[in-house]
Structures are given as C-alpha cells and as structure tokens.
Amino acid sequence: MARLFSPRPPPSEDLFYETYYSLSQQYPLLILLLVIVLCALVALPAVAWASGRELTSDPSFLTTVLCALGGFSLLLGLASREQQLQRWTRPLSGLIWVALLALGYGFLFTGGVVSAWDQVSFFLFIIFTVYAMLPLGMRDAAAAGVISSLSHLLVLGLYLGWQPESQRALLPQLAANAVLFLCGNVVGAYHKALMERALRATFREALSSLHSRRRLDTEKKHQEHLLLSILPAYLAREMKAEIMARLQAGQRSRPENTNNFHSLYVKRHQGVSVLYADIVGFTRLASECSPKELVLMLNELFGKFDQIAKEHECMRIKILGDCYYCVSGLPLSLPDHAINCVRMGLDMCRAIRKLRVATGVDINMRVGVHSGSVLCGVIGLQKWQYDVWSHDVTLANHMEAGGVPGRVHITGATLALLAGAYAVERADTEHRDPYLRELGEPTYLVIDPRAEEEDEKGTAKGLLSSLEGHTMRPSLLMTRYLESWGAAKPFAHLSHLDSPVSTSTPLPEKAFSPQWSLDRSRTPRGLDDELDTGDAKFFQVIEQLNSQKQWKQSKDFNLLTLYFREKEMEKQYRLSALPAFKYYAACTFLVFLSNFTIQMLVTTRPPALIITYSITFLLFFLLLFVCFSEHLTKCVQKGPKMLHWLPALSVLVATRPGFRVALGTATILLVFTMAIASLLFLPVSSDCLFLASNVSSVTFNASWEMPGSLPLISIPLISIPYSMHCCVLGFLSCSLFLHMSFELKLLLLLLWLVASCSLFLHSHAWLSDCLIARLYQSPSDSRPGVLKEPKLMGAIYFFIFFFTLLVLARQNEYYCRLDFLWKKKLRQEREETETMENLTRLLLENVLPAHVAPQFIGQNRRNEDLYHQSYECVCVLFASVPDFKEFYSESNINHEGLECLRLLNEIIADFDELLSKPKFSGVEKIKTIGSTYMAATGLNATSGQDTQQDSERSCSHLGTMVEFAVALGSKLGVINKHSFNNFRLRVGLNHGPVVAGVIGAQKPQYDIWGNTVNVASRMESTGVLGKIQVTEETARALQSLGYTCYSRGSIKVKGKGELCTYFLNTDLTRTGSPSAS
C-alpha cells in the first residue's frame, strides 16, 4: 500500500518508456472516470424510469450515487491535468482504486439484505479496471486486484458466517466468488500483459524509427556533402535522382535508355573566367618528399587555394598533379568574374611568395586567366569530376603555360572586363608558347600593387629561414611551415556528421523526466534551445504515440473508423499473420472453465446442462488442438504420413484472417451461450410462477407484506445472480482477442448486451422477482435497494462493462494499427536508409577507389590523418583520343560544341563500362583530362607487398593493363562504326613506384604522384596513334609476361632528356589481343 502511494515511479528498464507508458494510460484513466461520472448521472433517472420508483424511496442509493458523482468528478479534474498526472500517477491511481472499493462497499451494505453474491460484478469491474485502465505496473495492479478480491471474500465471509440462515449456502457461493475473482485477475493480468507487450513493441518500433530517421538524415547529409564536393548543387540533384533510380531498381549500372545514348549532364555558360595555375619547381621538390610529406604539402597548398577561391567567389574545377584550375561565374553568373579570377591569381602568387620567403625553398606560381564561354558538367559513368570544356578553356591553359612565374597572365578579353581595376604591362609571348604565338593576340601581365611592400617585409625572414635551411631538408622545412596554415582534411565533415548515426546513442534523460510535459505549447521557455534536433523529434514521436491521438485528425488513420487511409495498407493490415491467436483462445477457455465451475457450484446440475457442457468441452478441445497443433510436429513426424498435415492447421489459423475471425467469433459465442446455460435449464415451479405473477403487481412500500406462505425452497434461485456474473465474464472474453477488429467486437458486445438485458429484464425477469420474494418474505424486511435486485443490478453492470470494453476495444485497435504502422514505417525507413548508405558508398567510391573508401566510412573510420599510401609497383596508363581536338568545334549546328561533348561522353562512358567487367576489377580509373583517360593497376595491393614477392608476380597486373588498353581500342572502334568517325587511340604505359593520397577538403580528390606518373604521361604525349608506347623497363616486364615489344629508339622527352622507348606489338585500331611470344 505504501508503494502504491509513493510519488516517485518505480525503477524501470527505460525512463523513455515510463514517460510514454504514462501518456498512453492517461486516456483509459480519463475514460474510466468519465464512464463512472456518466453512469452516476444517468443511473438516477434511468433506474427511476425502469423500476417505476421515486428516487427518494431509496435514500441510501441516492446518497451513494451523489457522493460517487462528486468524488469521481474531482478525480476526473485532477487526471485531466497532464503535468500533475505525470508527476502523481501512482498516488492518483491508488486514490481511484480506494474510492472504487469504498463505492463498492457502500453499495454492498446499503439498500437491503446483504448476500454472498452481492456486488460481485462491481468488484469484478474494480479488479479488471485496475489492470486495464489504471496506469499501474503489473505488480501494483496484481496487488490491488488480489486485495480487492480477498477483501470481498473475507468481509462477506465474516459478516454472513455469523448468520445461521446464510451458513448453509455460504461456502459454495464464496467458492464461486473466488473463482470469479480469480478469473477476473487472470483475464485482467493477461490483458495488461498483452497491452504492455504491444505498447513496448510499438515504443521500440517508434524508437528504432527515430534512430533510423536520424541515421537517414545523417546519410542524406553525407550525400549532400559528397555530391557538393564533386558537383554543383543544380547538377547534384539531377544526377542523384538517376542514381536513386538505379539503386531502387536494383541495378548498379545505368538503366536501359531508349535512345541508346548515355545521359549527358553538360550545359553551356557564358560570361565565365577560367584560371589555370601551376607551381613552378614543385616537381623537383616532390622528388625529395616522403609520401606523407608530399600529401600533406599538396593538401595544405590546395587547401589554401580553395580558401582563396571561396573568398573570391571562384570554384575549383580540378587538380592535375601540381596544376590547379578554377572558374568564376559558375554555376551562377557573376558580373565581376574577371576581377575575381585576377584577384585570386594575385593572392595565390602572394601566398607562394610568402612561402618561398619564409622557407627559402625555390618555388613560384605561374597563373593564366582568360574570359569567355564554357561547357561545364560531368562526363562518364565513374569517378565524376566537374569539368569545363571549350576553346576558351584551352586558351586559358596556354596562358598559364606561356606565363611568367610569380605573375598573372591575362588575355585581352579579360583585360576588357577589368575596366581599369589593375595596371598591366604587355607580355612577350613570342618565345614562350607556340599556341599563343600562332594565335597572334596580345596578352598582358597584371601588376600587383602590393608585391614590392611584401618583398621588403620578407627580406629579414627570408635570411633567417635560409640559415635554418642549412640544417633541414627543404621538403621538411616546407611541410612544417605549411602545417601552420591548418587546411581542413578531406572528408573531415563525415566524422562530425556521424555522431547521431548509431542506434545505441542514448538521448538525454532530462528530456524525459516526468515533470516535463510533452505538450509543446507548454514547453518551458528555452527548452527548445537546450534540446537538439533529435530530442525534439523524439518529443514528436512520443506525442504521436499518445492514445488520445486516436480522437484527433491523422494523415494515417480515418478519425471515425481508424481505418488506414491507404487502401493497400489497410489490406496488408487485415491480411497480416497473428501467431498469438492461440493464446487468445487458451485464455478464453479459462473464462469458459470458470463459468462451468461457477455453475457447477451454485446449480442443481441438471442432465441437460451436463450434456451441453460435455459437447462444448469437446468443441473447445478441438479448437485448442487446431490452434496448438504446431507443437505436435515432432510427434506427428514419427507417426503415419497421413497425420503429417496436422501441424499445418496452426499455421493456417495464424496466417488466414478469414479462418481466424471465424474461430474467434465461434469461441466467444460458445462462452456467451454457456454463460446463460444454467438460466436456460433452470427447473420451473408452478408456485414460483404464481409468485412471479403476483410479485410484479405488488406495490412496494416501506413494509412489504407477502401473500401467504409459498414453497420456494425447491427452486435454486441462488443461480440467478451468478448467471448474471457469468454474463459479465462473457463480456470480458471479448477483451482477450486483442487483434480482433473493432467493428466485430462492437457487434459481438452489442449482441451480448441485447441478449443479456432481454433475458434478465424480460423473459427471465420473474426469476429475479422470485429471488427477491425469497429474501424479503418477512414483513419486517425493508424494501430492496436498486442494486440488490439481480435484474436491475445486471442491466446496470452490463451497460458499464459494455461501454468500458468498447473503449478498450477502440484503444486496442488503435495500438495494434499503430504498431503495424510503425513497423511498416521502420521497414521503409530501413530500406531507404540502406539505399542512402549504398548511395553514399557509391558516391564515395566515385571519388575514391573501393579499397580507400573504407578509410572514410564505417565504424573504423580513420580520417584524423591524411590518407597516403606508397606503392612499389603500379602500372599507369594514359590513353587519349588526339583526333577529338580537331573534331571539336563550336558552331550553331552542334550547339556551340555540346554535340561534340555528347560523343566524348559516349567514348568515356563506354571506357568506364569496361571497369565493371571482372577481368578489369584491378583497374582503377584516376581521372579524365579532356579526351585523355588516366587509369592505374596495382593500387589495391598493400604497402610493401610488392617487395615481399618476386618481380614477376609483383608486376603481373601489367598484363591486365595491357588487356584494358586493347579493350579501350576495341570500344573506340565500335564507336567509330556507329558515329562514322575514324578516331584512334594513343596510349602510354609506365610502371614503377607511386604515392597515392586524398587531398582537398572542399572537393576531395584521389590522385597518384611520382616520376612514374609523369613518364607515363610523356609516353602518351610523345606516342603514335594506334600504338601503346612504353619505357624500356616496362617493356622488359611485359616481355617477361609473354608480350612482344619492339624498340622505337631514343626520343626526346620533356623534363627527361633522351629516353629509349618501345611499342607493344599490337594494333589498337583492330579488335584483338596483343601477340604473345
């Protein structure tokens, strides 16, 4: 009792669930109090009208009802206040329980003769409501139910045990009462256990759904950052839609296209300035760096450039080795795009100048800028990189190549847009770049107004750095200085976004303390500022689970019927399996068994009743056998084959809604029928019939005089009130089928209400009159009270149980549907989350190789440091289509070059499709540079792995690259056939050590660096159309693998001097494999 009135809730598994459970039970509690108040209001005029009495004739009943009306109205007011209810749930529940007990004992000891069967139904109502409608835990509810039962038995046993006239039939009646209370406790506990299980399941589904939503939100943020790190927003949305379509269709490759062309995501923009910048002297410096130093240096340098680009409204396009190029005026047009690029170029030169002065390392910056129009977008299927194409882009590239270190080199078009913002001087380009010399247009060098001041300030620092440089490598000195710039690391945002992803992330307990109302209109000021978005969403979830929501407009449910608004969802709900049906049937059998025991205790057990019960028992055993037949699987398998189908009956019941509804309805009707069996088979005495006809016409006054002495002993009238109690148990049997539809429960309850009231108020009302005549046959007895007459008492309790169970049925229906809805939402969200995760992985693998992506995603993310990896043997391929430069033109016919890029997109996309073939799984696409395709093999090997294996095995992937190059030529031949062109492939191969890494926080980019890469690029640029040119070392490695190579001789290679190169003995213009010796 002390625990029940404690203001603090008992410790529970989950404080979140306690808050949710408290809210879910508020509605049944309010309904219980409302039913009691309404019954008190209706009882007075209804009873007076039904019995033909005046209210003043029964002052005890009138007083008790008025006290109940006042007391429970006060409790209703307290329970309707949400904040107080959450804080004082247990004390208020205890107070209601005590008030119900007091009301029950008030009815028991007022209004006439006290009998053993008196107010048993009301105490049964108390017991059931303690379990089903009061917000108590199972232990508290069980304690209250047992105390209510024992108190009634002990009080009546002690009170009636001293009365000689009551002792003869007292023991069977008390035993019948005990069976009734035991059944009520079991049914109540069973109902509560089912509801709590359903509530907890719904809560867990909702909580899982919340975590899924947060995870989904995180994945969406990942995608947003990943896409925007590769593409502009307008292009990201368009391409994301296509990827989602692929993933939802279960296809990793592109969907079938009716026009046989790959999707082209390229648009033309005018009024754009393009900046190319190259770090002069970096190649020599990089050769002295360790892999970690090289990647750190590049990331810091290009991170600084990205920062400068952002300040001047420029967008970096791509990083090509140590070359950086960007544009201004994309994707939105900017009037000052030329000024933006010039300012950025000057700031880049200043940054490198400061670096040179501070470290003493001889590096410089060469910048070229041109203004015009571009085609911008993405081509290919893999390793997307936003790029720009046009003659103006080519000119900007040559402006950088023909520029002066430390200066910004601009064209006349850019100069015209500067409008005198900067002073310039004429540039001498005759001896620098053939393209510019052939163009014949004048170019200019921008004069930096702050260059002289910075040079003077940096002289002292430069001398100091030069002294330190004598004891420190230039690369190390450079690295240490660049670390002070603090450039962001690639994909650093992923770690910040991952905090809410884990489903085990707890939410703050303060957000769910009972004194905090979940009504957002009452949320304390400043609370929203303290809670993060996830917590606010959890408040919304709790509110959505509130049982009061069933009476409010919902986008998922129909307000009146609770049907799902989506017909397909309603169909799925009704067809869903119900494995727990067998337990519903088993508990209903307990109610049936209780009715049987009660009737055997209080009736004369006529043969017809025994025969009927025997048949009903057989039907029930058959029903239970069908429901639990799956537990006989092992036994049946050992028996004859003709019995192997028996376990399928249980599955049939669980999965077939029609069969299940039929069995459930039949079970309840059996309980209904047998509840009144004793009444139907009650023997009739002519004396009792005579009495009944006279009693009904007697006018009841304060002193009731009976017409003579009548033999009533032969009639077992004591079974009349117990038949009424059995009818009440029949009502309770409907509550056991938790997943039975509300409309069916309504129909069965209404049917049983009409049948019960018809029996007790009409066809068999005379039996109640006989019992009253028996109890009040002495002239000294006062008139019986309203709740002392079985027929009136039964009708009142029938209506009370009818409305109570109807409300519970609607609540059960709401939670069953809500549980189904949350499970469906959770499945959808998990599928969507899985799709989003796959999309994130696909996007990340579109930026990074598959073996590098796990470094930045998943639970073992290691992006605290820059990713870098050195390899001893990597084969690098450069494959270009030089003829495309001549093919490309800009005219109205080809939409200013757009149709030319459409063909290039087909070429690159067909090349990309080769990567999905298993034989080329080891080939990694690095990037495309115009019409040049760069790829590498050997990057999926771990560092140092090559040195631990023999040379032949370590370079075996060179053969894969050769096969890939031949496949590229075959693909190009097919495109030539369909496009009526004669493009030819020029390929350069080289193998050796490289450094791989990821650089750039704004647009992370995976790249490889080293002499091997530079020489491979030279092998392509100095190669011959239709041939694969390789270095001498690579030729020897290929010959060891069985390929035939022949010498081309010595050629002059920029930056390398004279090199002896070889051609692979194959023709890329024909489909086939290279010849092998």
Curated annotation (Swiss-Prot):
Keyword annotations of the record:
ATP-binding, cAMP biosynthesis, Cell membrane, Cytoplasm, Glycoprotein, Lyase, Magnesium, Membrane, Metal-binding, Nucleotide-binding, Phosphoprotein, Repeat, Transmembrane, Transmembrane helix
Q: Where on this protein are sugars attached?
A: N694, N701
* Mechanisms controlling activity: Activated by forskolin. Insensitive to calcium/calmodulin. Stimulated by GNAS and by the G-protein beta and gamma subunit complex.
Q: Which residues lie on this side of the membrane: Extracellular?
A: 685-717
What is the topology of this protein in the membrane according to its UniProt annotation? Multi-pass membrane protein
Catalysed reactions listed for this entry: ATP = 3',5'-cyclic AMP + diphosphate
Transmembrane feature ranges:
29-50, 61-80, 94-117, 120-138, 141-162, 170-190, 583-604, 608-630, 661-684, 718-738, 746-766, 793-809
Question: Tell me, what is one Gene Ontology molecular-function annotation carried by this entry?
Answer: adenylate cyclase activity
EC class:
lyase
- Residue sites binding ATP per the record: 278-283, 320-322, 366, 927, 1007-1009, 1014-1018, 1054
Note how many cofactor molecules are bound and how. Binds 2 magnesium ions per subunit. Is also active with manganese (in vitro).
Q: Which InterPro entries match?
A: A/G_cyclase, A/G_cyclase_CS, AC_N, Adcy, Adcy_conserved_dom, Nucleotide_cyclase
Write the Enzyme Commission number(s) for this entry. Answer: 4.6.1.1
Q: What does this protein do?
A: Catalyzes the formation of the signaling molecule cAMP in response to G-protein signaling.
Q: Family, per the entry?
A: Belongs to the adenylyl cyclase class-4/guanylyl cyclase family.
State the domain notes.
The protein contains two modules with six transmembrane helices each; both are required for catalytic activity. Isolated N-terminal or C-terminal modules have no catalytic activity, but when they are brought together, enzyme activity is restored. The active site is at the interface of the two modules.
User: Under what name is this protein listed?
Assistant: Adenylate cyclase type 4
